[in-house]
Protein backbone atom coordinates (compact mmCIF):
# COMPACT_ATOMS: atom_id res chain seq x y z
CA UNK A 1 0.00 0.00 0.00
CA UNK A 2 3.01 2.27 0.19
CA UNK A 3 3.51 5.09 -2.24
CA UNK A 4 6.53 5.57 -4.47
CA UNK A 5 8.65 8.69 -4.05
CA UNK A 6 7.10 10.04 -7.27
CA UNK A 7 3.60 9.52 -5.88
CA UNK A 8 4.55 11.27 -2.64
CA UNK A 9 5.84 14.21 -4.70
CA UNK A 10 2.47 14.45 -6.47
CA UNK A 11 0.71 14.38 -3.08
CA UNK A 12 2.99 17.05 -1.64
CA UNK A 13 2.62 19.27 -4.73
CA UNK A 14 -1.16 19.16 -4.23
CA UNK A 15 -0.68 19.84 -0.50
CA UNK A 16 1.34 22.96 -1.37
CA UNK A 17 -1.59 24.24 -3.45
CA UNK A 18 -3.91 23.69 -0.48
CA UNK A 19 -1.55 25.48 1.93
CA UNK A 20 -1.95 28.67 -0.10
CA UNK A 21 -5.59 28.80 1.12
CA UNK A 22 -6.10 26.25 3.89
CA UNK A 23 -9.29 27.82 5.22
CA UNK A 24 -10.91 28.14 1.80
CA UNK A 25 -10.02 24.62 0.73
CA UNK A 26 -11.06 23.27 4.13
CA UNK A 27 -14.39 25.05 4.01
CA UNK A 28 -15.02 23.68 0.51
CA UNK A 29 -14.12 20.16 1.66
CA UNK A 30 -16.48 20.33 4.64
CA UNK A 31 -19.31 21.77 2.54
CA UNK A 32 -18.81 19.00 -0.02
CA UNK A 33 -18.75 16.40 2.79
CA UNK A 34 -21.89 17.74 4.47
CA UNK A 35 -23.82 18.14 1.20
CA UNK A 36 -22.76 14.74 -0.17
CA UNK A 37 -23.13 12.91 3.15
CA UNK A 38 -25.64 14.88 5.27
CA UNK A 39 -25.43 12.28 8.05
CA UNK A 40 -21.87 13.48 8.78
CA UNK A 41 -23.21 16.87 9.82
CA UNK A 42 -24.83 15.25 12.87
CA UNK A 43 -21.35 14.62 14.36
CA UNK A 44 -20.68 18.36 14.51
CA UNK A 45 -22.81 20.05 17.17
CA UNK A 46 -21.62 23.52 16.20
CA UNK A 47 -22.52 23.00 12.52
CA UNK A 48 -25.81 21.04 12.78
CA UNK A 49 -27.82 24.21 12.23
CA UNK A 50 -26.10 24.89 8.88
CA UNK A 51 -28.52 23.39 6.38
CA UNK A 52 -27.79 25.37 3.20
CA UNK A 53 -24.63 25.90 1.17
CA UNK A 54 -25.06 29.68 1.64
CA UNK A 55 -25.22 29.32 5.45
CA UNK A 56 -22.17 27.02 5.35
CA UNK A 57 -20.20 29.46 3.18
CA UNK A 58 -21.04 32.29 5.59
CA UNK A 59 -19.85 30.36 8.67
CA UNK A 60 -16.50 31.51 10.03
CA UNK A 61 -16.51 28.53 12.41
CA UNK A 62 -16.81 26.14 9.48
CA UNK A 63 -13.93 27.90 7.74
CA UNK A 64 -11.81 27.66 10.92
CA UNK A 65 -12.57 23.97 11.31
CA UNK A 66 -11.70 23.36 7.66
CA UNK A 67 -8.38 25.08 8.29
CA UNK A 68 -7.77 22.84 11.33
CA UNK A 69 -8.63 19.67 9.40
CA UNK A 70 -6.41 20.42 6.42
CA UNK A 71 -3.54 21.68 8.58
CA UNK A 72 -3.54 18.38 10.48
CA UNK A 73 -3.88 16.33 7.30
CA UNK A 74 -1.09 18.29 5.61
CA UNK A 75 1.23 17.58 8.54
CA UNK A 76 0.41 13.88 8.27
CA UNK A 77 0.92 13.77 4.49
CA UNK A 78 4.32 15.46 4.81
CA UNK A 79 5.45 12.47 6.89
CA UNK A 80 5.10 10.29 3.77
CA UNK A 81 3.53 7.40 5.64
CA UNK A 82 5.71 7.72 8.76
CA UNK A 83 2.89 9.38 10.68
CA UNK A 84 2.55 7.27 13.82
CA UNK A 85 3.19 10.18 16.21
CA UNK A 86 0.72 12.47 14.44
CA UNK A 87 -1.92 9.80 14.01
CA UNK A 88 -2.12 8.57 17.59
CA UNK A 89 -3.69 11.69 19.20
CA UNK A 90 -5.92 12.22 16.17
CA UNK A 91 -7.24 8.65 16.37
CA UNK A 92 -7.68 9.00 20.13
CA UNK A 93 -9.83 12.13 19.85
CA UNK A 94 -11.80 10.95 16.82
CA UNK A 95 -12.52 7.53 18.36
CA UNK A 96 -13.18 8.40 21.99
CA UNK A 97 -14.36 12.02 22.05
CA UNK A 98 -15.92 12.68 18.64
CA UNK A 99 -16.80 9.05 17.76
CA UNK A 100 -16.24 9.59 14.04
CA UNK A 101 -16.83 6.37 12.07
CA UNK A 102 -14.15 5.30 9.60
CA UNK A 103 -16.68 5.49 6.77
CA UNK A 104 -16.92 9.25 7.43
CA UNK A 105 -13.16 9.54 6.93
CA UNK A 106 -13.58 7.78 3.57
CA UNK A 107 -16.33 10.27 2.68
CA UNK A 108 -14.01 13.15 3.72
CA UNK A 109 -11.28 11.71 1.48
CA UNK A 110 -13.72 11.69 -1.46
CA UNK A 111 -14.58 15.32 -0.72
CA UNK A 112 -10.88 16.25 -0.62
CA UNK A 113 -10.24 14.63 -4.01
CA UNK A 114 -13.28 16.37 -5.51
CA UNK A 115 -12.33 19.81 -4.16
CA UNK A 116 -8.70 19.51 -5.26
CA UNK A 117 -9.76 18.47 -8.75
CA UNK A 118 -12.37 21.23 -9.04
CA UNK A 119 -10.05 23.97 -7.73
CA UNK A 120 -6.85 22.80 -9.49
CA UNK A 121 -7.86 20.78 -12.58
CA UNK A 122 -4.62 21.39 -14.48
CA UNK A 123 -2.37 20.37 -11.58
CA UNK A 124 -4.58 17.61 -10.16
CA UNK A 125 -4.96 15.18 -13.03
CA UNK A 126 -5.36 11.41 -12.98
CA UNK A 127 -1.84 10.65 -11.67
CA UNK A 128 -2.09 13.19 -8.84
CA UNK A 129 -5.61 11.99 -7.98
CA UNK A 130 -4.41 8.39 -7.88
CA UNK A 131 -1.48 9.29 -5.64
CA UNK A 132 -3.68 11.34 -3.30
CA UNK A 133 -6.23 8.52 -3.15
CA UNK A 134 -3.45 6.11 -2.14
CA UNK A 135 -2.11 8.51 0.51
CA UNK A 136 -5.58 9.12 1.97
CA UNK A 137 -6.32 5.38 1.95
CA UNK A 138 -3.06 4.76 3.83
CA UNK A 139 -4.12 7.39 6.38
CA UNK A 140 -7.60 5.87 6.69
CA UNK A 141 -6.24 2.33 7.05
CA UNK A 142 -3.74 3.38 9.70
CA UNK A 143 -6.30 5.37 11.67
CA UNK A 144 -8.71 2.40 11.46
CA UNK A 145 -5.99 0.22 13.03
CA UNK A 146 -5.61 2.77 15.84
CA UNK A 147 -9.39 2.82 16.32
CA UNK A 148 -9.31 -0.96 16.70
CA UNK A 149 -6.52 -0.71 19.31
CA UNK A 150 -8.71 1.76 21.20
CA UNK A 151 -11.70 -0.59 21.03
CA UNK A 152 -13.69 1.72 18.75
CA UNK A 153 -15.35 -0.07 15.86
CA UNK A 154 -17.14 2.87 14.29
From Swiss-Prot:
Chief location of this protein within or outside the cell: cytoplasm
Cellular compartment(s): Cytoplasm, Sarcoplasm
Positions with a binding annotation for heme b: 94
Molecular function terms from GO: heme binding; metal ion binding; nitrite reductase activity; oxygen binding; oxygen carrier activity; peroxidase activity
Pfam families: Globin
SUPFAM superfamilies, A to Z: Globin-like (SSF46458)
UniProt-listed InterPro entries: Globin, Globin-like_sf, Myoglobin
Listed EC numbers: 1.7.-.-, 1.11.1.-
Keyword Ribonucleoprotein listed: no
Positions carrying Phosphoserine: 4
GO annotation (BP), single: removal of superoxide radicals
Residues with PTM Phosphothreonine: 68
Membrane spanning stretches: none
PANTHER family, sorted: MYOGLOBIN (PTHR47132:SF1)
Family per record: Belongs to the globin family.
UniProt-recorded name of the protein: Myoglobin
Natural source organism: Delphinapterus leucas (Beluga whale)
Protein encoded by which gene: MB
Amino acid sequence: MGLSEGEWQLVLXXXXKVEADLAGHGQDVLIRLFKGHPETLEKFDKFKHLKTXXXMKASEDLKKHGNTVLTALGGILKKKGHHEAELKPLAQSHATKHKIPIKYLXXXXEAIIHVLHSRHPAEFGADAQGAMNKALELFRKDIAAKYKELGFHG
